[in-house]
Structures are given as C-alpha cells and as structure tokens.
C-alpha cells in the first residue's frame, strides 16, 4: 500500500509494493519485469483504520525504487501488479510518521541497486507523489539533452566487395534489431525520467546502477530510476520503431532507396549502381549529403556524394563507349542495370532465336545493344518516370537482390584478359593490387611542387610509391600495375582514330584530343590539371587547334616534362617488358654462299601470301611454299598473283604429323593466328583459350612437328605475329609456350599507316632498329593517285571495318579530290601496305572485300625488315 506522509513536497516519490499477507508467498521477479503476487491480496492498514481504495497509480506519476531486487525486477521498465494491488487512498491524506520511517525515506532518496528491502520489510514509507511537477528529459527535444551520445562514425573505403547470402543477411538483420531494441529501452529511460531535486545532502551508497539504466542527473549519478509503466510501454514501442525504421536519405536532395543512378569514383568512368540502405552494407549510416551505392557488375558498396551521382535517365551523357568496348565488368554492369530498368519500365525486348550454332555471348551482346539503343533514346515510351523504383523496393529490408538482379545471360560473358584496372583492387582479379587513396596522388604531386619529393620516385600515372621503372614518355616513375595497363592500352584506338585512354595514366573518362591531324594521343583532364597546373585543361579546351604535350614545341609543361629520347624509350619499353626470362634462341652461323639452298616454307594462316611476296622481293629462292588458309578470296589472290606456286592445304586443324613429314622438311614456319578473340578492342572477345584464340595452339603444335630432330643442325627459323592490344596474361601465355619474348614493331616507321604488332621468333636481328628504305612510301601523299591530295601524313590502323578509313575526332576522310573529301581507293590502300598496285584486284571482288583482305594482312616493309637476314642462309636469285 502506498501512503502519504507529511514529508516536504519536494522529496522524491518512490513506488512501493505492499508486503504480502502471511498466507501469501513473497513476490518473485518475473522475466519480463512484472511483479506478481500469486493470488494473494495485499493490504495495508492506517492508524485510523481507513482502508484504501483499490486501483492503479496515476499515469503521470513516476516512481523511484530503493530496493535492489525490485530494481532488478523492474530492469525492463515495467511494473505490472495484479488486480489485487492497492492504490493510494487519497493524495491529501497524511499518515503518521515515526523516526524509523523518516530514516527509511532518507535511504530511499539515495537508493541504488543495493537491496534494502529485507531490512525494512514491514516499515514502508509513503511519500507524496509529485509526478506532475517532474520534467521529462528530452521533452524539449533530444538535441538539447545533456545525455547526447552521438553514434560513432566509421569511414568506409571501397575495397573488397560484400557478397551477402540470404542466411547471413537474416542473421545480421536479427542482430541489428536486437541491438535497436536494447538501445530503445535505454532511450526510453532517459526520455521519461523525472528530475527530482535533493532535499538534503545524503550519504551515497557504494553501488553501481544496472547497465540498462543511465544516470539521470550529473549531480546524482547513482540514482537508479525507471519510467512509469504505461508511459514506458508506449515510449518503448515508438522509440524502437524510430530507431530501427528511421527514414534514410531525408536531406531533401532526392535519390532515395532503390533508385538507379550513375556514380563517379576517381579513376573510373561513370558506373551504374543502385541506392541501397546502410544495413545492406554491414557498415554505418551514410552521412548527410551522401548515399550508399551498390554497383552493378561486381556488387560492391561505396559511399558517394550526391554531387557525384546522376539519375540513370542521364544515360546518353554518362555512358562511355570506350570503356564498354574494353572492360567486360562495365559491359556486365550495363547489361544488369538495363535489365532492371526494362523490368521497371515494362519494356520487353524480343528474344533472339537460339540454336546449336548460336553463341550465347553473341545473343547477350545483341540484346545488350538493343537495350543500349533504347536507353540512349531516352527510355521511351515511359521515359525517366518509368525508372522509378516500385514501392516494395523502397523498403530497405525488402530482399530484391535475388529476384531482381538475376543475371543468367550475363554470366555468358567469358572473362577475357584483365583490362585496365585504374587504381582499384577487386577480388575477381588474379592479383591483389594496391588500393590508392583518392588524395594520395594529389598530395605527392604537391610535395613534388614543394621540392620535398622527386617526381621520379612516384608513379605519375596513379600516385603509387612502388615505382619499378621510368615512364617511357615523361619524366617520372611508373609502377608495375600501370606498366601492364600501358602495355595493353598504348596502342588501343577508338573509332575516331585516337587513343582510347589517357597517354599518361591509361584511364580517365573526359579526355583532350590533340588537334594535330598526325597525332592520335589523348590526355585526361585530371592528369592535365594535376601535372600541368590547375585550369590547364580548360585552357586547352579553349585553344583550337590544341597541340598535345607530345607534339608541342615546348618540352616542359609544369611538372609534365617530355623525355627527349622518348621514341627509343618507347621502343625499349615494349622490347623489355618481359616478366619471364627465357634462354636466348639458338644462333645459326651464316651458311657459305656455295652451300646455300632454296628455302622451304610452311605458312599457317597465310592470308594473301605476304610471306612469299617478300621472299621474292628479297630475291630468295623458294623451293616449296605450303600454305594453310580457309578464306576463298585470299586463296584466289595467292593463286593468281603467284601463278600456282603455292600449295594450299586447307584448314590448319586438319594438318597432321604425317603431312608435315610428307611435305617437309621445312626451313621456315610463319603464321599469325586470328586476333579477333585476343584483341581487347573486341568487346565480345573470348581470349586465348576459346573461339579463334585457340588456333594459336595449332601453330604451336605444327611448329614442334616441323622442328629439326636432334642431331640435325641445319638452320631452322620461325615467326609468329599478333596484335599488341592484347591482354597481358594472353601475351604471357603465348610467350611461355613459344619460350620466347616478343618484339613490338610499328609499321608507321616504314609506311604511311600505324600498325603496331608483336612478333615472336628466332629470326636473326629481330631487335635491331627499324630503318626505312628509299622505296618505302612514308607519307600518305606518296600512296595517292594523281590529282588527289592527302589531308594527313599518315593514317591510323586500317582494319577490316570500313570506318577505319576515317581519320580524327571529326571522322574526316583522308583524301581531298575535286574540292570534296574522299576515301582511300583500293590501289592506294595497297600502296600503304606495301603491296603492288592491283594486287588484290582479282575475281571481281568489291572494295569492301579487298579492304577486308588487306586489313588482315601483314605490312610488307615490316616483313621485309624481318626476313632480310635470311639472305645469309638461303640461296638467292
């Protein structure tokens, strides 16, 4: 029973549970914090014999507990007596007090967790309830509370991805909800607690409060309090809900959960992603003005500023074709985001008919192109409105990943050789690369400007301090990662004829293209502003035409200093890029003139018989020329131009050891397997071990069959050719099989066209400098017919595609005739490659068919350069 005393009204109010009757068992603390008397009726007797009314305490009263055990029973903030619990009779009634009760009251005012109820079982004090006078902490707003406990901030750096299984996600969610409920109870205690001034100084008890109950007043840290039952229940539920389901990203900047966006990270193109809740990442909440983004393609998470995000509807401005052509992960990301976008917009793309001969990756590529065209057209007919996430996807706890982000066809993208990896490490890559902070490069360059560091000690491409060699073009260092990127991308060109990536870092999305028609280099805005100086990129944009830092008259531009000997350094860079060491090839001494015999040649993937043409030009007698070729047009050209001296044997896969023994022995084996599935320019490439890439192993097989047996010391030579723009891993594998490192030769030194190629072989002097002859046509004008004017001194690499004839960023035709632009004629292309005029003019072939033959052929001056030493070994005319 709770009685009123005549104590002053400013004392603390304390709830008391009356003692049970002798017949009743003592109250036991229940697991949920309720105090229950099993069937017993609690009674209290006043001196006047008045019996109090039965009922519950008023809801606006807040009571303190002095009893330690009862305090533990009330640890969860609930006190729920049974119906037999008596309530105070009348707040105005005064009960007599004795000194013993006064001593009990003083102890209650200083009560802590330590138990005192056993000593004062039958001496309960009744204090006047003053709940209406109490002040609720946090009632004016939690921001003004003295007990603010800001959440610890955990910064997040993009790194290893989080692949969340359903089981693990459920475990995390359950754990976070338990933590939120626990925190909610603490907040409820702190929000509803009543401040009660102390009546007189009291002696503090040596006890500590329970972990779940926070001190309410700095002056009295040991007073353990609990909220009034009904209020605590309501606050518990509300606070738990607010802590667990508090809305995210409510900063008025848009881009809520579930929206499809483009995000920009330094060193990467704009990448598609999806805004997700913080709990999905397993990290802390994103700060105001930032969003958690889950990237398509690799499933990683990053915190990105709102300023670095664009809606997916900005597809035409954010989509980067060069990155799409090069990086398989980017293609996969585009495929996935457009799958989700088409699903939301209700756009259905017709399925491509599949049969046994249709490659799944080609089907995916066709569908992807259809979706990209739809996206570039503005996501019609629904437009950007149709890309908004449905209501269920805005729920942060909705499991949309397994249902919405399925990628059955995306897996058909066979992972080709690793492309440029701009300063970021992923677990999918075979090597773990160094993660460089966004500001590392800027900080190091600043130190160079302050003369605190040597620029040769840092990688000017990415900012790494793990320098392994010098940059071949500019003063500065280069790390191993950027070296591999440079090897892959230095000779990769877009459809406009310019390099696909920055000359310095082999990255960047926004690049400046040189205005010199004979230069094809690009520089990204980031490198220009960082190394040349702030604002240099804008100044270059305003300058028209702008000559880049490789062809400009000056050699120094801020910290960007061009090496004077860069041509030879670039040559040595590709000549000495070998991470594998092999024994030098066997050197054969020259054969005396009287002992020289005609050469016997096995040409695999022969094309239009460039090898035989060069041997004839050099005057070397050819005894036998066996060629493996499957293209009918190429066979026709070879048969007509060489009067049937070539023996065609069909598909290389059908040539056996028996055939080699029958046709041999051979003195020279040459070939260049198709590069379609090796070149990183091809977005659908399959690599060395699939598609046409596997044909390299046919060359390797027949090369070993044709080698001289042990004891046969006759000179034996071989040559294998392929593109420079191949993956580092593919080049490494080819070198490992051939037990030789390649040399890189660019035909621009001896012809009017760029054409960089790798050559493996044991021909003498393959590493010697490439020198032009008097008969080589080094300028495009020398290759043109009368009355035609060349607009460029050299053309870019001519391929099998018709648009490879166009030059420059504006796609100009290379020739000017009759005051009009014109393409190269077939006879002019033949001169560019070094072939005789009308060499491919057989069988009424069209212009495009002739260009396809030339686009797959070798450059005649380059092969002449490689074959020239053979005159010391074989008979000549």
From Swiss-Prot:
Respond yes or no to whether keyword Transcription regulation is given for this record. Answer: yes
Q: PWWP domain location, by residue?
A: 226-284
* Ranges of biased composition (kind: Basic and acidic residues): 107-133, 195-206, 234-244
Domain ADD per the UniProt entry, residue ranges: 447-579
Q: Provide this UniProt record's keywords sorted from A to Z.
A: Chromatin regulator, Chromosome, Cytoplasm, DNA-binding, Metal-binding, Methyltransferase, Nucleus, Repressor, S-adenosyl-L-methionine, Transcription, Transcription regulation, Transferase, Zinc, Zinc-finger
Keyword check for DNA-binding: yes
Quote the subcellular location field of this record.
Answer: Nucleus; Chromosome; Cytoplasm
**What's a GO cellular component annotated to this UniProt protein?**
cytoplasm
User: Which residues of the sequence carry a binding annotation for S-adenosyl-L-methionine?
Assistant: 606-610, 629, 651-653, 856-858
Pfam families reported in the protein's UniProt record: ADD_DNMT3 (PF17980), DNA_methylase (PF00145), DNM3A_N (PF22855), DNMT3_ADD_GATA1-like (PF21255), PWWP (PF00855)
Task of the protein: Required for genome-wide de novo methylation and is essential for development. DNA methylation is coordinated with methylation of histones. It modifies DNA in a non-processive manner and also methylates non-CpG sites. Acts as a transcriptional corepressor for ZNF238. Can actively repress transcription through the recruitment of HDAC activity. Also has weak auto-methylation activity on some Cys residue in absence of DNA.
Put simply, this protein is called: DNA (cytosine-5)-methyltransferase 3A
* Species, as recorded: Gallus gallus
